[in-house]
Swiss-Prot record:
Entry function: Joins adenosylcobinamide-GDP and alpha-ribazole to generate adenosylcobalamin (Ado-cobalamin). Also synthesizes adenosylcobalamin 5'-phosphate from adenosylcobinamide-GDP and alpha-ribazole 5'-phosphate.
Family matches, as PANTHER family: ADENOSYLCOBINAMIDE-GDP RIBAZOLETRANSFERASE
Record lineage: Bacteria, Pseudomonadati, Pseudomonadota, Betaproteobacteria, Burkholderiales
Cellular localisation: Cell inner membrane
Family, per entry: Belongs to the CobS family.
Name of this chain's protein: Adenosylcobinamide-GDP ribazoletransferase
TM spans (from-to): 44-64, 69-89, 111-131, 135-155, 189-209, 226-246
Keywords in alphabetical order: Cell inner membrane, Cell membrane, Cobalamin biosynthesis, Magnesium, Membrane, Transferase, Transmembrane, Transmembrane helix
Native source species: Albidiferax ferrireducens (strain ATCC BAA-621 / DSM 15236 / T118) (Rhodoferax ferrireducens)
Membrane among keywords: yes
């Protein structure tokens, strides 16, 4: 259990701005092997981030005046909190990927561009569109049901952090290995770590499904069958998005970088919201 907590806190330290400092940080420790073992807790980080964002969004929906634009405001501020909690870690990956692969047809040149800390036109446009689409889709879900919007936020943050584990498992790491912060995560991710990630994901999905009957009084307005169909549509859409991204990385780069993992998380999160909306 002690090792489990250490790996989780190390993953939290790596993927978010949530402070793990002082004596706690000393107790957690660090090594490339530990960071590699912590990869399975990537979705577990999504559980905490998703819970915080979902709770904040639910609070906004409760305290703000109930108008037609309330879901839009709550979605925008909830999304902003998510960006703050992660330090725009995944959005930065999305920008770098689209700068590199959108701005160059050559593999080596694309990898160089992706390492550049400056943001180009392709990257800026990709991040702006992703944020706009995320807020718009969440507002759409909120117009159907406030509870549905909050539940979607929670599950999407977990599921979208699960698919990158498959990318790590199936594709080789490319680029500057020595200078890559993600290299320990890319080396020989174990089946146990992969299973840990999927257990986190299944727990999140089970929580939402099992609480359906308990939350009917706050107007999800969906039968159990309809909720399952909508969730299935969202999960499938997210999975398809992962497959498309993985194929793109293989075709263009013959592997992945840390930026590719962040971009995958962002695209899969968007696909989940879209799939859920279509499945309603």
């Amino acid at each position: 259990m002690s090792q489990f907590i250490r790996h989780y806190l190390l993953s939290l330290q790596f993927f978010t701005r949530i402070p793990v400092t002082g004596r706690l940080a000393n107790w957690v420790g660090f090594s490339p092997a530990m960071l590699r073992a912590s990869a399975g807790h990537f979705p577990g980080v999504g559980v905490l981030v998703g819970a915080l964002v979902a709770a904040f969004t639910a609070l906004l929906l409760f305290v703000l005046p109930r108008t037609g634009s309330t879901p839009l405001v709550a979605a925008a501020l909830g999304t902003a909190l998510g960006v703050l909690l992660t330090g725009a870690f995944h959005e930065d990956g999305l920008a770098d990927v689209f700068d590199g692969l959108g701005g160059s047809a050559e593999r080596e040149r694309a990898l160089v561009i992706m390492k550049d800390s400056r943001v180009g036109a392709f990257g800026a446009i990709a991040v702006m569109l992703a944020l706009l689409c995320k807020v718009a889709l969440l507002a759409l879900l909120g117009a159907v049901s406030a509870t549905l919007m909050v539940a979607a936020l929670f599950v999407a943050h977990v599921l979208s952090r699960t698919w990158p584990l498959l990318t790590i498992r199936l594709l080789p790491h490319v680029g500057d290995a020595a200078g890559s912060k993600s290299k320990p995560l890319a080396d020989q991710i174990s089946v146990a770590a992969l299973l840990t990630g999927f257990i986190w994901c299944f727990m999140a999905l089970a929580l939402v499904i099992s609480t359906q009957s308990a939350t009917e009084y706050i107007a999800i307005n969906l039968t159990d069958t309809a909720l399952l169909q909508a969730l299935l549509s969202a999960v499938v859409a997210s999975c398809v998005a992962w497959a498309v991204m993985a194929r793109w990385f293989w075709r263009r780069l013959q592997g992945f970088t840390g930026d590719c993992l962040g971009a995958t998380q962002q695209v899969c999160e968007l696909a989940f919201y879209l799939g859920l909306a279509v499945g309603l």
